[in-house]
Amino acid sequence: MAVDLMRFPKIDDQTAIQEAASQGLQSMEHLIRVLSNRPEQQHNVDCSEITDFTVSKFKTVISLLNRTGHARFRRGPVHSTSSAASQKLQSQIVKNTQPEAPIVRTTTNHPQIVPPPSSVTLDFSKPSIFGTKAKSAELEFSKENFSVSLNSSFMSSAITGDGSVSNGKIFLASAPLQPVNSSGKPPLAGHPYRKRCLEHEHSESFSGKVSGSAYGKCHCKKSRKNRMKRTVRVPAISAKIADIPPDEYSWRKYGQKPIKGSPHPRGYYKCSTFRGCPARKHVERALDDPAMLIVTYEGEHRHNQSAMQENISSSGINDLVFASA
């Protein structure tokens, strides 16, 4: 190994590596050919010499690759074969391993002419619209890539909703396909479609979807409106929390909540004059003057004073009837 390297002291390392590697590969190919031939043809060639020559060339390549700037070389054992025999063997290997001229077949690839994008017309008045040789609507499918030609306007119009119907024909304009998510769901549209029940279909104060319950109840979401608020200060009639000054309506307490920074809670009342009245009020003590009450009214009453009087009179008549009975 070291002897072969010392023979070329002035050759560049890269050139020496390439030469040694090529000679080793050629000798290895020659050895493979010899071993693959018939047994009666192997007695003329000594496989051991070819193997030694191949191994020596690969060792030379390894030594050249591992060598550094100040490497030291040791003289290896001298091979018993003479230099003339090695040169003769090398010439024989080169002669047998000359590559044959490869047959090159040139194929001319004609570029495909892509027609300009055009609109697709579908005529539903005719029995058959898609033929096997239709040129206007041709879809190109491949195993690895799925590509749709200019006739993808049908799919794009089906997705984007572009298209017009006239005299039994649909004219579809070509448009790019919208991307689809990996989960298979279409992207969220800017204007979501919402179904309303028939009762609130044209109402602006209701929004939402129709519930699928069997009872057929309306579950439309009511839009929150700003309620009318009115605040008044009235004197307290007693120190009890439940005692509030009366007014022209009847109220029923439905809850209370503590107030931060005040020892007195806030009471919540709703109108009990008529069932379903949306009017509410809450009463709390004033922080600056505990003898005053702050009453805040919310919402409007859905009844008038005449209806209240009729309700009171009817309730009085019923009491008299029950008393006489």
From Swiss-Prot:
Q: Which UniProt keywords apply?
A: DNA-binding, Jasmonic acid signaling pathway, Nucleus, Plant defense, Transcription, Transcription regulation
The record's account of tissue expression is: In young, mature and senescent leaves.
Location in the cell: Nucleus
Record's keyword annotation contains Transcription regulation: yes
Induction comment from the UniProt entry of this chain: Strongly during leaf senescence. Repressed by rhizobacterium B.cereus AR156 in leaves, and to a lower extent, by P.fluorescens WCS417r.
Top-level division of the source organism's lineage? Eukaryota
Give the main location. Answer: nucleus
Q: Which GO terms describe its molecular function?
A: calmodulin binding; DNA-binding transcription factor activity; transcription cis-regulatory region binding
Q: Which PROSITE patterns match?
A: WRKY
One GO term of the biological process aspect: defense response to bacterium
- The residue stretches assigned to a coiled coil in this entry are none
The GO cellular component terms are: nucleus
Query: Which Pfam family, an example, fits this chain?
Result: Plant_zn_clust
Family annotation (Gene3D superfamilies): WRKY domain (2.20.25.80)
Q: What happens when the gene is disrupted?
A: Reduced rhizobacterium B.cereus AR156-induced systemic resistance (ISR) to P.syringae pv. tomato DC3000 associated with reduced jasmonic acid (JA)-mediated signal pathway. Plants lacking both WRKY11 and WRKY70 are totally impaired in B.cereus AR156-mediated ISR.
Q: Does the keyword Translocase apply?
A: no
Instruction: Summarize which parts of the chain are annotated to bind DNA, as ranges.
Output: 240-306
Q: Which family does it belong to?
A: Belongs to the WRKY group II-d family.
Role, per record: Transcription factor. Interacts specifically with the W box (5'-(T)TGAC[CT]-3'), a frequently occurring elicitor-responsive cis-acting element. Regulates rhizobacterium B.cereus AR156-induced systemic resistance (ISR) to P.syringae pv. tomato DC3000, probably by activating the jasmonic acid (JA)- signaling pathway.
Name used for this protein in its record: Probable WRKY transcription factor 11
Lineage of the native species? Eukaryota, Viridiplantae, Streptophyta, Embryophyta, Tracheophyta
